[in-house]
């Protein structure tokens, strides 16, 4: 391990000792904001310091075993101990480097997930509905809540565009790599000749902005229109102008919300989506720059990139960024995304570790 990393770990150990001492003082709770800050810092430092302590213990075991090598009677035993200690040190070294990776400040946040039907017409819209169900089922498995914010349904079912809000700790950390182009290969329900068609949808995953604090919205930059909410096929579902359309004039971004119970609710939700989109645009610009520097395929924020193919005849899902193929399409479409998300997170961590080593 690099001396600079060891020095950093020692500083964190010293800081944990200091924070523990401060939390133990009688006056610690007199300033609750500071108390909460210290408690959070204690929780973040503890796992790193515990692994560092195990690392130092393994190094001590290695030194003891190497001393035993000079004793002929203990030589074989010492060799086994040295091998075990070196393996342990290697594992802990990797774990420590992962723990020291820069944290994404958005990882614990709720998300907005936008799914738009692309090439393929009605079949693409049906697939958009399938993707929404897949993410909803994944959210259920994690005990997260799903709220439909806005939906533009197609004639045959499915969605031309749908925006959902997923509420749950860590939602962004698990789903942030879902942004991009999703392609489906299957025989559509409307196909009488049994031919396989290829359709596509675009998915965008955005962290929810913190009470509009993450991004400043100047009222002069917004045009707010109201109109009557409508259902599938354009039929009006109420007689009041409760639906809201907000246009961000500097960027041309448009957000519509009509699923809320009132104009006020729709406006509030639309403002949240707009803030998330603007925040996301800034984040993607920074990510694209970083990704170009380290030639990264994961987390580049490129929405035009085709990231995954769902092949129904073969029961296959392939993530093209990491060359991962799973023959468990039914399970994946039912929300079993853990194997894919874990692999993407591991690859992203490997890229960050490689960058640390440069």
From Swiss-Prot:
Entry superkingdom: Bacteria
Matches recorded under NCBIfam families: prfA, PRK00591.1
SUPFAM superfamilies: Release factor
PANTHER family per record: LD18447P (PTHR43804:SF7)
GO molecular function list: translation release factor activity, codon specific
Family: Belongs to the prokaryotic/mitochondrial release factor family.
Protein name: Peptide chain release factor 1
SMART domains hit by this protein: PCRF
Modification sites for N5-methylglutamine: 235
UniProt subcellular location: Cytoplasm
Role: Peptide chain release factor 1 directs the termination of translation in response to the peptide chain termination codons UAG and UAA.
Pfam families named in the record: PCRF, RF-1
Organism in which the protein naturally occurs: Neisseria meningitidis serogroup B (strain ATCC BAA-335 / MC58)
């Amino acid at each position: 391990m690099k001396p600079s990393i060891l020095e950093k770990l020692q500083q964190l150990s010293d800081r944990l000792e200091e924070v523990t001492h401060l939390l133990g003082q009688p006056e610690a709770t007199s300033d609750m904001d500071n108390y909460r800050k210290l408690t959070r810092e204690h929780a973040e430092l503890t796992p790193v310091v515990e692994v560092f302590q195990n690392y130092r213990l393994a190094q001590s075991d290695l030194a003891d075993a190497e001393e035993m090598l000079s004793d002929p009677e203990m030589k074989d035993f010492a060799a086994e101990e040295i091998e075990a200690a070196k393996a342990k040190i290697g594992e802990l070294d990797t774990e420590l480097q992962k723990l020291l990776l820069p944290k994404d400040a958005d990882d614990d946040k709720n998300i907005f997930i936008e799914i738009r039907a692309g090439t393929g017409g009605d079949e693409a819209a049906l697939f958009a509905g399938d993707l929404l169900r897949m993410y909803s089922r994944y959210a259920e498995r994690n005990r997260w809540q799903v709220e439909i914010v806005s939906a533009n349904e197609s004639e045959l079912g499915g969605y031309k565009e749908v925006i959902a809000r997923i509420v749950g700790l860590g939602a962004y950390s698990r789903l942030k790599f879902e942004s991009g182009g999703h392609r489906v290969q299957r025989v559509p329900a409307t196909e009488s000749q049994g031919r396989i068609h290829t359709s596509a949808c675009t998915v965008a995953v955005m962290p929810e902005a913190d009470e509009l604090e993450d991004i400043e919205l100047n009222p002069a930059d917004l045009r707010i229109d109201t109109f009557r909410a409508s259902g599938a096929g354009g039929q009006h579902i109420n007689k009041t102008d409760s639906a809201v359309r907000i246009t961000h004039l500097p960027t041309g971004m448009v957000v519509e919300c009509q699923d809320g119970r009132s104009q006020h609710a729709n406006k509030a939700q639309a403002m949240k989506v707009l803030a998330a989109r603007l925040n996301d645009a800034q984040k993607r610009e920074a990510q694209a720059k970083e990704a170009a520097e380290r030639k990264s395929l994961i987390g580049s924020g490129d929405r035009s990139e085709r990231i995954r193919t769902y092949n129904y005849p073969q029961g296959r899902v392939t993530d093209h960024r990491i060359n991962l193929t799973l023959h468990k399409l039914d399970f994946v479409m039912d929300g079993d995304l853990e194997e894919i998300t874990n692999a993407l997170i591991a690859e992203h961590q490997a890229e960050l570790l490689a960058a640390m080593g440069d």
